[in-house]
């Protein structure tokens, strides 16, 4: 209980008493004045923190900002230290160096994982991409990042409710008949809840409600700045490994992904386009019901992860058929003019569900569900055509001179950088890529050579130099290729990668054929002798390629499914 003596000693009581009596206020010693100043400041801060919302929010923001900066700084410093130590140390033999580097990879990957999880948001997205780069990064890094695909930090129900009140002016309870407080999926930028909308019939329809993490609004500018700073520091300490381009790409794409109205537009456009290709793709894109900048309401479509082999096998779904549909989906996006490319097809953004074969699913017994349409890119027609010609030169013509010519055209590289780019595009070793030996599955030995060899000599610095030169839209095409290649490997397709390469070659051949038709129509009068001859020649070349591909596909199927005893006899 506060006593009268206590109140009489408060500064304002002392001042009031001396004014009333006319006596002068005695001078305090410097030490006493300093104590009073510090105490007064602390007391004022406590009062403001508890009773002034603006001051409270400022202090809280400063504390959280300091924490995020500290997490990034500490993780970066520790990784720098461990790698500097491991790379500069002398080893008795190559095996000892390899073991030491593997330990360093694992240690730094765990440090990074902890930092990414601690800060969440765009850091999770960085970790997801690291986890998908199996063709490039050591196994210790990619395996460590796998949990980030669908085990991300979630926002509380109270935070989501505040988001609805702030953005829509209504609470969750007022808008929905039912709302599951536990999200069915949590990603780096948002989480999804199952709910039932209030309908006029009083029953309610099941929907998926995608809610952006509220904290992103406050910290995205800071996080973008921090990641750019980290990459710039890497550039200072490791000038041979330029990574500032990654920070630039993150800054240019993250704000697009955070606008859910743009995602709704991409989803509806893609859903409408692929409705014509159900037989080839079995693709299902949830219909958008309502969209806002930070809230997206869609039809609810359930499913399992695409790499859930137990679910696939138990429902009688063909792995090779799923792999083929995946290949059709993303090659259609990459090679068809004016069609957007989904640039984030990692395991958490794809699902598979068992259905009854019908016309609206292409008579498949499954559907591939594609989520998260926030980031799409539209490469120029020239880029798509050069990219198609590169693959035809590799897979069909087996002509390294042509490969180099087209790679320089779409990737802005030098002759010396071509071998490494070929390996990066194909996800194979340099020898395999340049010897046209990429249609067979990667062996464990090849993957080990690629992962461990990346730190030998100047290979890693050369690769980073290439990535810093490549146009951003081409980088996103390569990223999409990386992620779909990783998914295909997870499916353990019994037909191997040969089938997916055959499908891609069909799209490449059609792209080149369409380009020649366009050129012929612009150069010659329609129905002239020359026009008809050029079109006939172009059609014959195209049909010959397609028929060869069909024959290879048949042979592949025959070798896989016809009993070996028949083949031997």
Swiss-Prot record:
The transit peptide spans 1-18
Q: Please, one GO biological process term?
A: lipid homeostasis
Q: Membrane side Mitochondrial matrix: which residues?
A: 19-34
Q: What else is known?
A: Present with 1600 molecules/cell in log phase SD medium.
Q: What is the lineage of its organism?
A: Eukaryota, Fungi, Dikarya, Ascomycota, Saccharomycotina
Cellular compartment(s): Mitochondrion; Mitochondrion inner membrane
Offer one Pfam family short name for this entry. Answer: ABC1
The UniProt function text for this chain reads: Component of MIOREX complexes, large expressome-like assemblies of ribosomes with factors involved in all the steps of post-transcriptional gene expression. Involved in mitochondrial lipid homeostasis.
Q: How does it sit in the membrane?
A: Single-pass membrane protein
**Would you say which domain of life the source belongs to?**
Eukaryota
Where would you find the membrane-spanning parts of this chain?
35-51
| PANTHER family (UniProt xref) | AARF DOMAIN-CONTAINING PROTEIN KINASE 1, ABC1 FAMILY PROTEIN
Question: Cellular component GO terms, alphabetically?
Answer: mitochondrial inner membrane; mitochondrial membrane; mitochondrion
Hey, which family's this protein in? Belongs to the protein kinase superfamily. ADCK protein kinase family.
Name recorded for this polypeptide: ABC1 family protein MCP2
SUPFAM superfamilies xrefs: Protein kinase-like (PK-like)
Could you tell me the keywords of this UniProt record? Membrane, Mitochondrion, Mitochondrion inner membrane, Transit peptide, Transmembrane, Transmembrane helix
Q: Which residues form the signal peptide?
A: none
CDD domains hit by this protein: ADCK1-like
On the Mitochondrial intermembrane side, which residues? 52-569
Name which cysteines form disulfide bonds: none
